[in-house]
């Protein structure tokens, strides 16, 4: 198939996965069969069961680079979930942020997430 040939001709494999940790791990193990470095260039969607605490340990276990889409709440509106097209969050924020990690004032959306990210990346506490 075309998809198989694309992967086989690639030096690295980049992919997106917004699913739960079990699905993420299944995707990773299937891609590892091609024996290429793996780059997960989008992975975090809290309301879809894809979280830092669920995804990053799997990525670390298999040495997969993981890039988060969204850092600070802002104009790109990546706090909004996919259903915001059907249910605009005009007068209230979504109950669960989709991507971003920090509010515009620099405070974390979830201190537990930030602590976890520091822990798993070996960054420790800020100076």
What are these regions (language model features)?
Residues 119-127:
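Non-catalytic accessory regions flanking glycosidase/transglycosidase catalytic cores in CAZymes
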Residues 1-116:
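Extracellular glycoside hydrolase catalytic/binding regions
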């Amino acid at each position: 198939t075309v998809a198989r040939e694309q992967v086989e001709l690639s030096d690295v494999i980049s992919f997106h996965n917004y699913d739960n940790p079990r699905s993420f791990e299944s995707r990773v193990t299937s891609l590892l069969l091609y024996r290429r470095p793996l780059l997960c260039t989008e992975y975090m969607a809290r309301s879809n069961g894809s979280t830092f605490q669920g995804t990053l340990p799997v990525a670390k276990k298999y040495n997969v680079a993981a890039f988060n889409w969204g850092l600070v709440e802002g104009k790109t509106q990546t706090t909004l979930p996919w259903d915001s097209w059907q249910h605009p969050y005009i007068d209230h924020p979504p109950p669960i942020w989709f991507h971003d990690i920090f509010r515009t004032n620099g405070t974390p959306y979830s201190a537990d997430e930030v602590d976890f990210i520091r822990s798993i990346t070996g960054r420790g506490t800020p100076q």
